[in-house]
Structure formats: structure tokens, C-alpha cells
Amino acid sequence: QGFVFDPRDETFQLTGGGGQHGMSMDDWGRTYVCANSEPFSLVMYDSRYLVRNPFLQAPPPAVNVAPAGKFTRLFRTSTVEPWRALRTRLRSQGIVPGSDEGGSPSGFFTGATGVTVYRGDAFPAEYSANLFVGDVSNNLIHRALAVAGGLLVTARSAETGREFVASSDNYFRPVQMANGPDGCLWVIDMYRELIEGAAFLPPSILKHMDVGSGVDRGRIWRIMPAGKRPSLPRLSKSKTVELVALLEHPNGWHRDTASRLLYERQDPSAIGPLRQIATRSSTPLGRTHALYALAGLKALGPDDILAALADPESRVREHALRLAEPFCHDDARVQSRMEAMVGDPDPLVRYQLAFSLGVLPGTRAAGPLAALAIKDGADAWCRIAILSSISGCAGDMFRQLAGNRAFRASLPGRTFLAMLAAQATAIRPADVDVVLVAIDGPLADDQPAARAIVAELMDKVTSETRTRLAGTGGGRARAILAELLDEARATAADEKKPPKIRAAAVRALRFASFVTEREPLAALLASRQPGEVQAAAVDTLASYSDAAVAGVLLAAWPGMSPKMRASAAEAIFGRPVWIGAFLDAVESGSVGRSDVEPSRLNLLKSYPDLAVRTRAAKIFSSGLARRQDVVAAYQKALERKGDRERGRAVFEKNCSSCHRLENVGQRVGAELSAIRDRGLEAVLLNILDPNREVMPQFLSYVLVTTSGRVLTGMISAETANSLTIKKPDGSAENVLRLDIEELRSTGQSYMPEGLEKQIDVAAMADLLAYLNSVK
């Protein structure tokens, strides 16, 4: 996540769309961030809008807009660094283990940093609004064009066969950039010999390197067109009226700095000139900056807003909507004008309108939001914007759209209507009556829409609302639910149907009771059933809370494949009462101790339920050896010649639940595609002592829901309203924050200690041989 800092009272708050190192806004305030392998990501919404509807689950706001992402072609001109050449020579001579290739692959993004939108005036016009990002590993700066398309942009490489800047100096590390006061692009060069993490160098080489080489040589570069020597302004000496005039300057630094100084001075003499620019400036950016400056002086009024909402430039109208929000409660003229903007020709204006309508009082937003749903509801981002604004009017909006036959006749319309029904009843449970009336009324002759709504409600609403729908008060919805379940049972049992279709039907059975579905689901766990169907049966059983669920899963355990056992264990470990049955099975021998993966042992050590922790400690009392002793004992694996094919089998059995190589396994843990370049000593250390150095994104968390379920995994994504937990079986689950009872880090890597219990020295040599062979 990102954060917003207020220098007035030294407070800050979290916001959406954080990156790793680098954040920049274009002239109109659209925010870009970057990460090591994601050079350009566009932030699509402000989290302050999302939190108004705590039931809304949305994707992370930062979206990769580079078509090739990490694999965008880069044209490096620097040679392989000396330490890489040394490592290659030592490997080829057999002095150190590992690949004899010269360092990690180059030519694509592995260290993207410092994303910056060019907003200066020193470069030729075609550079305006270009995107720049450094790649420290490749010693270059990449330039891209931001090509507009609907709500998103596409970052397309601007150069052909070359880079904007490519240095032959291996120490050149462009970590950050800025638009300078002279209109040029300024670059912070960290200037270091070593930029990689320690894990990517064998310890035997690392100990001979000066990891601080270059620490005293950092520098700032200024990139300017040949023949130009721009001067540096001193705006701190400018008069207030001069600062106001600078809001129309073609250089973004001048506009931003003038805006800041006007805010700092709080000079009331600026109000008149600002109002002149806000209404009469020939530049849309000047008009927009003037509006914000008036707001900063607490001088912005409804008349200013009304004029801006009618501005001929769409970007001015977009910002006027944001500035109008404080006036929406009291000024009927502003309210009416905003409502009339549902027909605005610009999609970005309507997108902002969908967010801003949420501040209208009472149920007044229902009509314009319904109109936007009809016009833009097929777009996923517009749906998020609309649904963020429905907290005060969801039921009224549903009533209007349910009566619109043309809207619900389309698949996007039915989909939106179903989502709205679930949101409305979650926000205000009494609105289930609105939905039931619609199903019995305008939707009585619209079977597709009614079925979509009932299915969505059963999937998303509370157990109390589900009971209401399935009970005598459910009316026609009850009959529809019965039809859906009958169809699902028939499809799930039909072995002639494709596995994917059957699996979807099996998952629909979670709407029924465990008592009625116990036997059919148990039958679907049989080993002769397709894997997809078995997995769906496990998921459906996990959705129930009955104590007997664990018995059904454990009865099928002997015939389950390793992958299916991982899924079953994930389900069983979700509730303390089920873990009790699992521990019974371990004690009785029906589940072997070797079947319990190290990751599960890690979870048991930190399980929220004390009784579970205590009992597990007794059952698995052998404990784990000291890490340094294990690492020392396994050094023999580095000296042995391993077998690649046997190593592949070791990987598939012990590692594939969290890692993926050569189309085998799950993408849960760290990416292993370039693991051979770390050196086998480092790889062995990572396997046997995973907690020696843990990156934050690979920490293990335990999450307890308000319904008593326990999830364990890594936090793979988060928004203002929800967290996404990536689980050991490779699946991911999105959990609303309001459904979280407890969330805590275990302080441990998600990769467990204790793999030596499954992998002996000979098998480790085979595994290392396999990992070292993967290209």
C-alpha cells in the first residue's frame, strides 16, 4: 500500500497502490508505481472511496500496463560485471558449484525502479507525458509511451533497438528520477558495484567482495537536450501574483511548486487572480491548478464548482467532480449538476462521477448510479466505482434496475444485478425483502436473471439470509434454489459431463446442508473421480462447519493423491474441531506422521487454539534439529553428483505444493526460474534454514475469521477492504476485513524448517542437480 502524509499535523494514512521504489503522477494526477519486475503500473482508484462499502471486494488498485511486463525487451550495453565473470570462471573450473553461465539473464526487467512521468518543457514535444523507469541490474533507463485506451493506458516501448539511456558503466544504478525546475530529467545514480541481494551470490565469493564498493560515489545526473543550458528559477522570491501566473506554466515543476508556495503562504490577495485563471485561462491545466489553489485557501465556492463541472475540457470536469464532493450535502445546484453528468461523453469523467456520487445524501444517488450501471456496468472498473458508492441507496438502486427489462436481458446486466443484490442485502439485511419482492414481481418471467440473483445471494450473503431464502419466506426464490440444487446434484454425479462442468456443480452444493450432501460428496472423493471433481468436493465440504466433515475427508485419505491430501489437509486445518480428528488419525496410524508436511507442523506450533498446540506438541515431540547442525551435515550433498530425474521426483513430492518449475507445482512461494544463478551453496542454505533471511512477502500469517475458520498462508494482495491469503495448496482466498477476527504473523518464513526429515543427503544432491539444470 501507499500512504498520504499531512505536514500540517504530521499524520499519515494508508492508501491504495503502493509499489516497491518509485511513484509518479502525470499532469492530471494519475498515479504510476513500479516493482522489480513490473516497470509500469497504473493506480486505478483511491482507497478512500472503497472503504465506504466494506462489503466490496476489489482487485488491488495498481494494474500492470506494460504489455510484456517483466519480459519487456531491454537493450543493455554494459558488459558482465567482474564479480559475475569471476563467479562464472570458478564454476566452470568446478571450484564452486552452480551454473557456468555468466550471471543472471539480462535483457528484461529484474530491477525496475524510480518510475517517472516526464512533465518538463526542455525536451521536444513528443517526450511530453512519456514514462521513464530505471533498471538497476541492466544499467539503463527505459522510455515508454502512455497510449490511452478507455480507462487504462498501455505503456509501449518508445525506442527501437536501443534505450533512452544505456551505460557501459556497471556501477550505473539509476534508482530514482525527477522532473527538474529547468524542465530536464534529473536522475539519482546510486552508483554501486553490487546491487543484488546476498542470496544471489555464493558465500565463498561474497566474502571476498566489498559490498560497499561505490558507496561514496553516488551522483545526480541532469539529462538535457544538446546545446541547451536551462536556468534554475528561484520561486521562493516570487510575488504572490507571479506565483498565480505560474499555474499556467508549461513546466509541471513550476505549476506544482507555485501551488505549494501559494498554499504555504495562505495569502488572501491570491484569491481574485486565482478566480480569474480558474474561469478564463486558456490552459486546462491552469484552470485545474487554480481550482485546487482556491480550495487550499478555503476560497472555493459552489459557483466555481458549477463553472468547472461545465468546462469544455474533460479532465477539468473530472477534477471538478472531486472538488465538488464537500458541497454535495448542502448545495442542491451542485447535486443536480452532478446527477446530470451521467451522460458525459468522456469515460474517465463518468468513472470519477461513479465514485463521487457516493457523497450525495440519502438515496439521491440511486438514480444516477443506476444510469451509470446501464451505460458502463459491463466494465469491471466502472462496476467497482459504482458499487463503492451504494451504501446509502443499494436497495433503491436494485429496485430501479430490476424493473429495467432491457438491462437485465444482457449478460453484463444480469451479472451486475446479481452483484448489486448481494451487496444490498449485505449492507442492509432488511433489503432482502426488496430482492424477494423483485423475484416474485418484475423478475417472475425472467428466469435467467432470477437464477443469477439467487445463486449470487447464496454465495455471498450471511447464513441468516441464506436461511431466509431457503425457508418459507423465500417465495419464488426458494423454488429457484431447489431447482439449482437439483440440477447441481444431477450434473455432479453425471460422469459423462466434462470435469470442469461437474466441478462447478459440486461447488454449488455448498448452498445445501451437510446432512443431505454428505454421502454424495463422499462418493465424489473416490480416487476414480477426476482431480477437478475431487478438489471441488473437498472445497464444498470445507464450506460446512459440521464436526463430521473431518471424518468424511479422513475416510478418503488413504486413496488420495499427494496433491489431494494437501487440499484435504488445508480444509481440515481450517477448524480446531477438525484438527482434533486429524490428530486422532495420526495417533492411530491411519494418517502417517510422514504425511504431515513441515508447513503443517509450522502451523500447529502457532495455531490459535491452545489445546491444539499442546496436543500437537506431544504428538510431534521429536522436534527439529538445530539449523546450523543440519546445514553442516548436508554440505556432503554439494560434493555428490546428483541425478536430475530423481531430483525432479524429489521436487514434485516435497516442493511442488509451493513452487512451480517446468509446469509442475503451485505458484505460492518464491519464483525459482532463475534459481540456478544463486549458486548451490545459497540454495542449500535457503532450503534447510529458510528463516535465516525472510523477505516480508514470504512471511506466514494465521487468519481467524469471525465464523471460526482458520486460514494460513502468505498475504499476496490487499486493498482497503480485504486481504488475499495464498494457501499451501496453491489456492487463494479473498477475505473481507470485517470478516477477520484475528490476523497475526508467525514471524517465520512460509517455507518450513524440517525438510531434512523428508529429504536425506542423497536425495538433496539429486534435488540440487535438478534445480541447477532448469533453464
Model-flagged regions — what are they?
Residues 1-242, 253-254, 261-263, 663-664, ...:
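Beta-propeller domains with acidic blade repeats across secreted/periplasmic ectodomains
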Residues 26, 134, 180, 706, ...:
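A short, compositionally biased micro-patch
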Residues 113-114, 184, 219, 273, ...:
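C-type cytochrome heme c attachment motif
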Residues 119, 145, 224, 247, ...:
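Sec/Tat-exported extracytoplasmic proteins
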Residues 188, 210-216, 223-650, 675, ...:
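Long, ordered, helix-rich scaffold segments
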Residues 260, 288, 687, 703, ...:
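Gly/Ser/Thr/Pro-enriched helix-cap/hinge segments flanking short amphipathic alpha-helices
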Residues 290, 607-625, 680, 709-711, ...:
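C-terminal capping alpha-helices of c-type cytochrome domains
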Residues 299, 347, 562, 576, ...:
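Short flexible coil/turn linkers enriched for glycine and charged/polar residues
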